[in-house]
Swiss-Prot record:
Compartment(s) where it occurs, according to its Swiss-Prot or TrEMBL record: Cytoplasm
Record pathway: Cell wall biogenesis; peptidoglycan recycling
Entry keyword S-adenosyl-L-methionine: no
GO cellular component: cytoplasm
NCBIfam families, sorted: PRK05337.1
One record GO biological process: peptidoglycan biosynthetic process
Transmembrane regions: none
Main location: cytoplasm
Assigned EC number: 3.2.1.52
The UniProt record lists the keyword Nucleus: no
Source organism (scientific name): Stenotrophomonas maltophilia (strain R551-3)
Function description: Plays a role in peptidoglycan recycling by cleaving the terminal beta-1,4-linked N-acetylglucosamine (GlcNAc) from peptide-linked peptidoglycan fragments, giving rise to free GlcNAc, anhydro-N-acetylmuramic acid and anhydro-N-acetylmuramic acid-linked peptides.
Protein name stated in the entry: Beta-hexosaminidase
Gene: nagZ
C-alpha cells in the first residue's frame, strides 16, 4: 500500500485517477497543500469523495518547526519545550504533553484528517533533523512522555505513530539529504533508543514509522529496508502488532535501494505495510511498481479517525480554549 503526496491545494484530474488505484491507501498533506483551515477541510472531503474506498489522510503536525498547518491553528510548541519542564515538575510536564497531544489531534481531526504522524520518540542527542522535535535525551524521560502523548491522541480518536524506529536521534546526519550510519551495537540500542518505543507499544500505539538510518552492527541496510529490524526486532522482540510505515522514499538516504521501484519493493519485502511516496513526481512510477503485489488493505482500517467535532463544535468546546490558555501560561508562547 502507498500513501501519496499531491501537488497543491486542490486535486488535479491525474490525482483523482491515482485515488482510484487499489494500492493507494491515502494521502499525506504538506505546507504546499494548505491555504486556510476551510480549504484543507474541503481538500480532505474531496480526497474522500474521489476514492472508492476509505482513505487515510495524514499530516506532520508535531508543533515547533514541523507544523504544516499554521494560520487558524494553535501554534504548538516543540516537544523539547515540554521536556525541559520534566526535571522540576514531572507530573505537570507529562500532563502538558497529554494536553499538547489532545490539542493537536483535535484540530487535525476537526479538519477532516485522520492522523498526524506523532509523536517523535527519538532521543534528543544532536541530530540535525530531530533537534527540538524530541522531548529529551534521556530514554526513560522520553518513554514517560511517549505514553502520555499516546493517551492524549487516543482521547480524540486519533491513532498514534511512533517515529523513527529504531531511533534517529543519535546520528548527526539528516536523512532527508544524507546517508546516516549509527555504529552502535544492538544491546546499546536496546538500552537506549528502543526504550521509548517499548513504552509507546505498551501504551497502545497504533503505528510505527521506520528510520532511513543504517545500523551496520545489526543489519547492512537502512532500518526501513531491513527484515531484521521490522520482523525480528519490532514485531518479534517488541511484540508490535500495528501498522509499519516507511519514511518517505524521496529522501536521500532511501536511495541506497536503487530507483523508485526498488525502494518500494525493498520496503514491502522487509515488512513495511505502507510506503510513503510524498513527492507527486514519483507516484506514477511507484504505482506501476506495485502492480500484481498482494496488498494488506485491512491493516489500515484501525488508523482511520474515530469521531470528530468539526471546527464549529471544537471552538465551542471549552476544553479547546482552556488547553490553549494553559499551554500559553506554562510555556510562554502563543498557541
Amino acid at each position: 500500500m502507498l500513501l501519496i503526496g499531491v501537488a497543491g491545494t486542490e486535486l488535479t484530474a491525474q490525482e483523482r485517477d491515482w485515488l482510484q488505484h487499489d494500492a493507494v491507501a491515502g494521502v499525506v498533506l504538506f505546507k504546499r497543500n494548505f491555504a486556510s483551515r476551510q480549504q484543507v477541510t474541503d481538500l480532505s472531503a474531496a480526497i474522500r469523495a474521489a476514492a472508492p474506498r476509505p482513505q487515510l489522510i495524514c499530516v506532520d503536525q508535531e508543533g515547533g518547526r514541523v507544523q504544516r498547518f499554521r494560520e487558524g491553528y494553535s501554534e504548538l510548541p516543540p516537544l523539547q519545550d515540554i521536556g525541559a519542564l520534566y526535571a522540576t515538575d514531572p507530573q505537570q510536564a507529562l500532563a502538558l504533553a497529554e494536553q499538547h497531544a489532545w490539542l493537536m489531534a483535535s484540530e487535525v481531526r476537526a479538519s477532516g484528517l485522520d492522523l498526524s504522524f506523532a509523536p517523535v520518540v527519538d532521543l534528543g542527542r544532536g541530530n540535525r533533523a530531530i533537534g527540538n522535535r524530541a522531548f529529551s535525551e534521556d530514554p526513560q524521560v522520553v518513554a514517560a512522555f511517549t505514553a502520555a502523548y499516546v493517551r492524549g491522541m487516543h482521547a480524540v480518536g486519533m491513532a498514534a505513530t511512533l517515529k523513527h524506529f529504531p531511533g534517529h536521534g543519535t546520528v548527526l546526519e539528516d536523512t532527508h539529504v544524507d546517508t546516516a550510519i549509527d555504529p552502535r551495537a544492538l544491546d546499546e540500542l536496546r538500552a537506549q533508543d528502543l526504550v521509548p518505543f517499548q513504552a509507546g507499544i505498551a501504551a497502545g500505539a497504533d503505528a510505527v514509522m521506520m528510520a532511513h538510518v543504517v545500523y551496520p552492527q545489526v543489519a547492512p541496510e537502512p532500518a526501513g529496508y531491513s527484515p531484521r529490524w521490522i520482523q525480528d526486532i519490532l514485531r518479534g522482540e517488541l511484540g508490535f502488532r500495528g501498522v509499519v510505515f516507511s519514511d518517505d522514499i524521496g529522501m536521500a538516504a532511501s536511495h541506497s535501494a536503487g530507483g523508485v521501484p526498488a525502494r518500494v519493493h525493498a520496503h514491502l519485502d522487509a515488512g513495511c505495510d505502507v510506503v510513503l511516496v510524498c513527492h507527486p513526481e514519483l507516484v506514477d512510477e511507484a504505482l506501476h511498481a506495485v502492480q500484481g503485489r498482494s496488498l494488506n488493505t485491512a491493516a489500515l482500517l484501525g488508523l482511520l479517525g474515530r469521531g470528530a467535532l468539526g471546527w464549529d463544535g471544537l471552538l465551542a468546546d471549552a476544553r479547546h480554549g482552556d488547553t490553549q490558555s494553559h499551554l500559553l501560561e506554562t510555556l510562554g508562547r502563543t498557541v
